[in-house]
């Protein structure tokens, strides 16, 4: 019972919660920031709205990363009497924090790049490819967190 304390599952629940909360915060910021850029750009160039929606979609994908890890963690939560160790709780917390904080950072990057990129593309269409490349690098930050979280999750 010493390695299965009653508070062990608390850390697992905190891992699941932090995975979805922080990645959703990043996705929300990225969506809001790039969405304001799209709204400002569409006043002058309404024909570019559908082309400029890419940053919003990429920001939404960040939340899916957190959702995947949160569902994985929540699916393996169990009571301490059913051999849910403190080690497992810490692993789940680490996995949730990894994907959550990397999703938060990626969402911030996508929002800032998406806002500036959409506004710049409205004035100079050749900036579109550069914006997409930078957005891909920002999205990969969230993907790194997902990879680390899944790797940690499999260590239980």
Curated annotation (Swiss-Prot):
GO cellular component: proton-transporting V-type ATPase, V0 domain
Subunit structure: V-ATPase is a heteromultimeric enzyme made up of two complexes: the ATP-hydrolytic V1 complex and the proton translocation V0 complex. The V1 complex consists of three catalytic AB heterodimers that form a heterohexamer, three peripheral stalks each consisting of EG heterodimers, one central rotor including subunits D and F, and the regulatory subunits C and H. The proton translocation complex V0 consists of the proton transport subunit a, a ring of proteolipid subunits c9c'', rotary subunit d, subunits e and f, and the accessory subunits VhaAC45 and ATP6AP2.
Ranges that cross the membrane: 8-30, 53-73, 93-114, 127-152
Database matches in Pfam families: ATP-synt_C (PF00137)
Keywords carried by this UniProt record: Hydrogen ion transport, Ion transport, Membrane, Transmembrane, Transmembrane helix, Transport
Name of this protein: V-type proton ATPase 16 kDa proteolipid subunit c
Gene3D superfamilies: lithium bound rotor ring of v- atpase
Organism per entry: Manduca sexta (Tobacco hawkmoth)
Function: Proton-conducting pore forming subunit of the V0 complex of vacuolar(H+)-ATPase (V-ATPase), a multisubunit enzyme composed of a peripheral complex (V1) that hydrolyzes ATP and a membrane integral complex (V0) that translocates protons. V-ATPase is responsible for acidifying and maintaining the pH of intracellular compartments and in some cell types, is targeted to the plasma membrane, where it is responsible for acidifying the extracellular environment.
Domain of life according to the entry: Eukaryota
Annotated disulfide bonds: none
Keyword Membrane carried by entry: yes
Positions in the Cytoplasmic compartment: 31-52, 115-126
Family from the record: Belongs to the V-ATPase proteolipid subunit family.
Subcellular location: Membrane
């Amino acid at each position: 019972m010493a390695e299965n304390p009653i508070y062990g599952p608390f850390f697992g629940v905190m891992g699941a919660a932090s995975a979805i909360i922080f990645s959703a915060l990043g996705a929300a910021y990225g969506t809001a920031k790039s969405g304001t850029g799209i709204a400002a750009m569409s006043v002058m160039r309404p024909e570019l709205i559908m082309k400029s929606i890419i940053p919003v979609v990429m920001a939404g994908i960040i939340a899916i990363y957190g959702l995947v890890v949160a569902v994985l963690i929540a699916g393996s939560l169990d009571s301490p009497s059913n051999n849910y160790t403190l080690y497992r709780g810490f692993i789940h917390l680490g996995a949730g924090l990894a994907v959550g904080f990397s999703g938060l950072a990626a969402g911030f990057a996508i929002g800032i790049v998406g806002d500036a990129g959409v506004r710049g593309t409205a004035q100079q269409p050749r900036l579109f490819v550069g914006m997409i490349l930078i957005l891909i690098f920002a999205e990969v930050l969230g993907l790194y967190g997902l990879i680390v979280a899944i790797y940690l999750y499999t260590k239980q």
